[in-house]
Amino acid sequence: MAPLASPSVIPKIPPWLLRRDSPLRFRPELDVDQWRWCLEFLAACNQRTADTTTERLLRLAFYSRSLMHELVESESIDFDYVQNGKLVVHTHPESFASAVRLMEYQRSLVAEQRALDPRQCVELEPALEHMAERMAGAIYTPSEDVGDTYKFCNELKRLMESGPDPVAFRFGVEVERLLPWRERLMGVETNVGVLEADHYVLALGTNAPYLLEPLGIRVPVYPLKGYSLTLPVTDDRGAPRISVTDFKRKVVYARIGDDLRVAGMADLSGKHAVIDAERVDQLVEEVARTFPRATDFSALKPWCGMRPATPRGTPVIGATKHANLWLDVGHGALGFTLALATGRIVADLAAGRVPAIPLDGFILH
């Protein structure tokens, strides 16, 4: 696990900006938030900051994984969850050498990983045979999990509605503004009236700044548009069992139930979640080149979403200047990876409990 902001990104930025099929695409807008985010991102592209961010993300991810294991063991939930490991594949020797150095650093933080050569990669994941000649090596993390996030959210909703203290969900209600009173919130104004509560948790992704800025609170969150394809697996041996990340192309492949989920791209191109057909075609080409026998492309389901990214890659969680307003935003592409940890931390803080892990680097200043 490593942040996007790192020294290795700097030399890649010029070619990324010039190529239409680059994994990171930038379309400048007359948007102060976009340019400020870009400057803060570039400032974070140094080794010291990258190492610190890596340590913090691993700390949070390990905690989230332990909470996930507790949940799966204690509750009967079905979301195609499986612990199948992950391979991060590198196609350039220099990139692989850098990944090995990062692996050694992450090992010092108790991350279980090992480096594999191309032959070992294909032995572990035979579906990678079509990529073998392009591979320099891969980093294997056996403890990685996958699951269907949509099913997971529905299962959590079911559990919360059926528990001893049932939760009421109010879908379709639009939050218009937060109502501060001195050092607290007195309510939330919505399209159906004012809602009042003891505590308020703001977990709105890229929409968080719109509600916080009138209160004088700035969170460095800006949308990075990402894409995914969901494809039926038509050849079991042709589709990967282990999750695979193509490091150069920034594309992730994961078997989820009977489907292959393919996700990638990062478009810094404004705040509109509109699917770009060209980006979908590029993802299709990546799948066809890497796992040509895996699926039937005529049945693909494309999707795009706005990742709430911070320049450093760390979420913003915890307290604000209003005593009963809490933040849980800025997870970027790691929402599912970090969600249980950040949710538990905010719940602990609101209840007056001490969180299980240190929060340096996550608190809003």
Model-derived regions: residue spans:
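Short, conserved active-site loop motifs that form the nucleotide-linked donor/cofactor pocket
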Residues: 166-168, 260, 325
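Surface-exposed helix-capping loop/turn segments at secondary-structure junctions
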Residues: 70-82, 162-168, 217, 291-298, ...
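Helical element adjacent to the flavin cofactor pocket in flavoenzyme catalytic cores
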Residues: 97-109, 129-199
